[in-house]
Amino acid sequence: MGLRYCRGMSNVVIPRFGELLSPYISQVPPEISPRFLALLERGAASRYRGWAEMLPEHSEVLLRCAEAEDEIANRIEAAFPMDESRRAELEAPLPGALKTYYDVFAPLDPWDQLRVQANAERQGAGAWERIASTHPDPKVIEVLNSCSELELSSADLVDALLAEHDGR
């Protein structure tokens, strides 16, 4: 199930990424699921680098978004320490999750891919906010809220690129 996005000639279905990826996220024990989400953030960073190559005239903005995704992952990894003996358990569902994520974008042109990603950033911000709302540690809550802000900042940057592109 997804949300329909209409803009000009574009008619893109925006998936609910939490629902789409829940079969993979649910395979990870709850106490390390933020670390799994951090790995997904690194996947998004890789996507942004790919878009920067496809759209070199916009690479500065897209690479800023990639850096933000990596920064989110770094902050989450620092805030949620994990015994390295759990690495295999953490990474086991990752290939399926990344394939599912990438498959959403496969049939779309780069601009529609960015439309989906801008919405995914806003969904990601909501996910960090939901985790923060139930976390007992104020310092971790601060980190989670900062991650949400980075997600929203990237969404705004991508929305500005899309507005510029659509205005042509």
Residue locations for each model-derived region?
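Non-heme di-metal
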Residues: 2-168
